[in-house]
C-alpha cells in the first residue's frame, strides 16, 4: 500500500512538473528574419490598440531575402522593404491599384514611416509620431 501511495505521488509530481514546462504561446517566434514571411494584420492605434484591417485581406505581405531586405506585394504591385532608419518601402511596379481595397491608404502611410520594431512574431512600422503603426504578423506559409 505504501508503495502504491509513493508511486501515485511521484506520478502526480511528474505530471505537474511536465505541465509547468509547457510553452504557453500559440504562435511560432522566428529567430532571424531571412526566409520569414509577414502579412499585414492592419493599422493599429497605439493608444487604444484597436486594429483596422486593410482590404483585401492577405494582399499586403513580404518575405525577407536578407536580414534587412524583403520582397513582397500589395494588391497588384510588387514591393521591396528595407529595414533602415527610417524603414523604407519601395513600390517596384506601378500598376494602378489605388482603387483596389485600401491600397491608396497603404501607399500614403508607407511614405511617412518613421521607425520599426521587431518583437517575437510582430513587426511594427510606426508613423504619425508613433501614434499609429502598420502591424505585420509572422506567417508560416
Where are these regions (language model features)?
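Sec-dependent bacterial lipoprotein signal peptides
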Residues: 1-19
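Lipid interaction determinants
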Residues: 21-141
Amino acid at each position: 500500500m505504501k508503495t502504491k501511495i509513493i508511486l501515485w505521488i511521484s506520478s502526480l509530481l511528474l505530471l505537474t512538473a511536465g505541465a509547468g514546462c509547457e510553452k504557453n504561446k500559440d504562435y511560432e517566434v522566428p529567430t532571424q528574419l531571412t526566409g520569414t514571411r509577414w502579412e499585414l494584420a492592419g493599422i493599429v492605434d497605439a493608444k487604444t490598440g484597436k486594429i483596422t484591417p486593410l482590404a483585401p485581406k492577405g494582399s499586403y505581405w513580404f518575405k525577407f531575402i536578407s536580414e534587412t531586405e524583403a520582397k513582397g506585394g500589395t494588391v497588384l504591385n510588387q514591393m521591396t522593404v528595407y529595414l533602415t532608419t527610417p524603414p523604407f518601402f519601395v513600390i517596384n511596379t506601378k500598376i494602378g491599384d489605388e482603387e483596389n481595397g485600401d491600397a491608396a491608404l497603404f501607399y500614403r502611410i508607407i511614405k511617412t514611416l518613421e521607425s520599426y520594431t521587431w518583437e517575437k512574431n510582430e513587426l511594427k512600422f510606426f508613423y504619425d509620431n508613433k501614434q499609429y503603426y502598420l502591424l505585420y504578423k509572422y506567417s508560416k506559409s
